[in-house]
């Protein structure tokens, strides 16, 4: 049975390439790792019954991006929340047994209706897989929501991530 949640230390191991095997999906290391734990991952859950991932990121005023984005007006860059959603789709593909290294391929639509400021305590990412392709092409297509303290603030439709073997990346 596959593991259904992951601690920060386990995510760091994934970032070192120790989870899915050499040449396969890895998460980025901090500070680009944009979540502290995966609280739920399921192969057949979510809105579309194709898979679900939920992760959390503890926010504190000392996080690196608040010091530079923006001086006197600290806010987490929206692109980091978008990247976190891509990270989670890639993790799902590796967790599902897909071979290769993850690469973001695009997103259909992104809406920002709120922000992450230093007073926010927790960001939650919710990813609903719409399509999972496990052939020569390994790709996940998903919708995602980012919440700040339980309030939806970003929405992404058709997040696309692919896994590519060394041979595919060389050609």
Curated annotation (Swiss-Prot):
InterPro entries: FabA, FabA_FabZ, HotDog_dom_sf. GO terms for biological process: unsaturated fatty acid biosynthetic process. The active site is at 69. It catalyses: a (3R)-hydroxyacyl-[ACP] = a (2E)-enoyl-[ACP] + H2O; (3R)-hydroxydecanoyl-[ACP] = (2E)-decenoyl-[ACP] + H2O; (2E)-decenoyl-[ACP] = (3Z)-decenoyl-[ACP]. SUPFAM superfamilies: Thioesterase/thiol ester dehydrase-isomerase. It comes from the Bacteria. Its EC number is 4.2.1.59, 5.3.3.14. GO terms for cellular component: cytoplasm. GO terms for molecular function: (3R)-hydroxyacyl-[acyl-carrier-protein] dehydratase activity; trans-2-decenoyl-acyl-carrier-protein isomerase activity. The keyword Ribonucleoprotein does not apply. Pathway: Lipid metabolism; fatty acid biosynthesis. It is found in: Cytoplasm. Homodimer. Necessary for the introduction of cis unsaturation into fatty acids. Catalyzes the dehydration of (3R)-3-hydroxydecanoyl-ACP to E-(2)-decenoyl-ACP and then its isomerization to Z-(3)-decenoyl-ACP. Can catalyze the dehydratase reaction for beta-hydroxyacyl-ACPs with saturated chain lengths up to 16:0, being most active on intermediate chain length. This is 3-hydroxydecanoyl-[acyl-carrier-protein] dehydratase. It comes from Caulobacter sp. (strain K31).
């Amino acid at each position: 049975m596959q593991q259904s949640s992951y601690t920060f230390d386990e995510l760091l191991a994934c970032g070192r390439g120790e989870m899915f095997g050499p040449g396969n999906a890895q998460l980025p290391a901090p500070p680009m790792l944009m979540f502290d734990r995966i609280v739920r991952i399921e192969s057949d859950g979510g809105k579309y019954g194709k898979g679900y991932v939920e992760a959390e990121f503890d926010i504190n005023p000392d996080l690196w991006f608040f010091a530079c984005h923006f001086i006197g007006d600290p806010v987490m860059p929206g692109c980091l929340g978008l990247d976190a959603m891509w990270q989670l789709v890639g993790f799902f593909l590796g967790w599902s047994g897909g071979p290769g290294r993850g690469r973001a391929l695009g997103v259909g639509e992104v809406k920002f209706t709120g922000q992450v400021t230093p007073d926010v305590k927790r960001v939650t990412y919710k990813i609903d897989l719409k399509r999972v392709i496990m052939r020569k092409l390994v790709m996940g297509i998903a919708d995602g929501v980012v919440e700040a303290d339980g309030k939806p603030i970003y929405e992404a439709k058709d997040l696309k991530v692919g896994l590519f073997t060394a041979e595919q990346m060389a050609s």
